[in-house]
């Protein structure tokens, strides 16, 4: 991208992209409880922080500009492509959108949104019947929606890493982990032995080997 066409300061794109992905996730997740809104709010904050740096103000590039110019003297740090830091650090040439990690990110994003949607469908019907969700992705792991959010966030980190989102990511992991524990305490109180048996046979976040995370 040439300097005649600004790479940053595109605040309309910040708003549009943030709104698209937040509303897209909202349509799948449909938060209903205070815990749901905390989960979704943290995800939304990550998305906004990401697109602010992607199209608004490149804080990470600004803070690393001295090191980047010394390490990569031919790098045009004012170009949009320079924001794809993994591509730069790995020494990839050409269009960064065709880089290995960028392509991998599409799979994380696509599967994350797919898992989020599939998990919500199972959970919705279980809640209507006042039953424990144990089918679909819930047959493989106990918290597929939290895993879905993590996959989506990780996918975005592969596309456009920033200092702020890299710092937020482990914090969100801890937050989602604690929310999962709180949720399980409530499920244990509500469903008793049924939940205990479910928890014994179903891992919390990572499916057992040979028991792939599917939605069937």
Task: Show the residue positions of the predicted features.
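Helix-loop-helix units of permease transmembrane domains in multi-pass membrane transporters
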Residues: 134-140
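Membrane-anchoring alpha-helices and their flanking helix-loop junctions
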Residues: 1-134, 152-186, 190-193, 197-216
């Amino acid at each position: 991208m040439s300097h005649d066409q600004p790479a940053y300061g595109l605040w309309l794109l910040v708003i549009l992209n943030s709104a698209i992905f937040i509303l897209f996730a909202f349509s799948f997740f449909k938060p209903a409880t205070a815990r749901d809104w905390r989960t979704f709010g943290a995800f939304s904050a990550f998305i906004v922080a990401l697109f602010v740096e992607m199209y608004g103000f490149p804080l990470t590039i600004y803070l690393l500009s001295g090191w980047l110019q010394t390490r990569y003297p031919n790098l045009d740090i004012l170009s949009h492509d320079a924001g794809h830091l993994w591509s730069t650090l790995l020494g990839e040439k050409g269009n960064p959108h065709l880089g290995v990690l960028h392509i991998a990110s599409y799979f994380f994003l696509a599967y994350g949104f797919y898992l989020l949607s599939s998990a919500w469908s199972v959970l919705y019907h279980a809640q209507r019947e006042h039953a424990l969700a144990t089918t679909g992705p819930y047959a493989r792991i106990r918290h597929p929606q939290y895993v879905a959010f993590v996959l989506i966030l990780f996918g975005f980190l592969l596309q456009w890493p920033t200092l702020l989102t890299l710092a937020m990511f482990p914090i969100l992991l801890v937050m989602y982990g604690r929310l999962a524990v709180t949720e399980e305490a409530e499920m244990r109180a509500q469903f008793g032995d049924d939940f205990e048996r479910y928890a014994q046979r179903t891992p919390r976040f990572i499916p057992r080997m040979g028991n792939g995370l599917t939605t069937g």
